[in-house]
């Protein structure tokens, strides 16, 4: 279970492991990046519609913007955005079979576990590295628990920001 499903004090302990990345000071420090990302997406949107053809604002702006932000916080490479977006859509769109939705969830968990191993080997300034180095390496969490937290932030970060 992740901290969403826990009561205090376990909820507070697990939430505390990642909350510094979501505090105002950290978000304020990302503001220039967020504004630039929004501007880049808007510029790309304008370029797509320069000949008067319609452009899907949701697909080309509203969905990618929060994804880029949460992926930056987590440490997810942007090159993986299409795969992650597709898997998340399958698991949440309501028209997939239960088997397909479950497979998509497992695909995301497997992806996060692989990324977690990479961050253990080469940490960066991101949530996954922080969990790996500060929680799993010293034995406060096992890898599966840390992967679940990262998975929760990945899927909830996309869903709640949009």
Predicted stretch roles:
Residues 60-63, 67, 71-72, 135-162:
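Central I-helix of cytochrome P450 enzymes
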Residues 4, 23, 27, 117, ...:
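Alpha-solenoid HEAT/Armadillo repeat architecture
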Residues 41, 84-139, 144:
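Cytochrome P450 catalytic core segment centered on helix I
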Residues 1-58, 67-85, 89-95, 99-103:
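Active-site substrate-recognition loop segments, prototypically the cytochrome P450 B′-helix/B-C loop
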């Amino acid at each position: 279970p992740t901290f969403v499903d826990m009561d205090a004090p376990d909820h507070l302990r697990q939430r505390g492991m990642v909350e510094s990345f979501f505090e105002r000071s950290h978000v304020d420090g990302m503001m220039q990046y967020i504004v630039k990302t929004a501007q880049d997406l808007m510029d790309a949107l304008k370029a797509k519609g320069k000949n008067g053809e319609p452009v899907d604002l949701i697909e080309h702006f509203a969905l990618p913007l929060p994804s880029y932000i949460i992926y930056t916080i987590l440490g997810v490479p942007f090159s993986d955005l299409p795969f992650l977006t597709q898997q998340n859509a399958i698991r949440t769109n309501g028209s997939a079979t239960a088997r397909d939705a479950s497979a998509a969830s497992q695909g995301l968990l497997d992806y996060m576990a692989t990324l977690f191993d990479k961050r253990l080997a080469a940490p960066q300034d991101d949530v996954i590295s922080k969990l790996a180095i500060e929680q799993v390496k010293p034995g406060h969490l096992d890898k599966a628990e840390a992967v679940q937290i990262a998975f929760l932030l990945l899927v909830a970060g996309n869903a709640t920001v949009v």
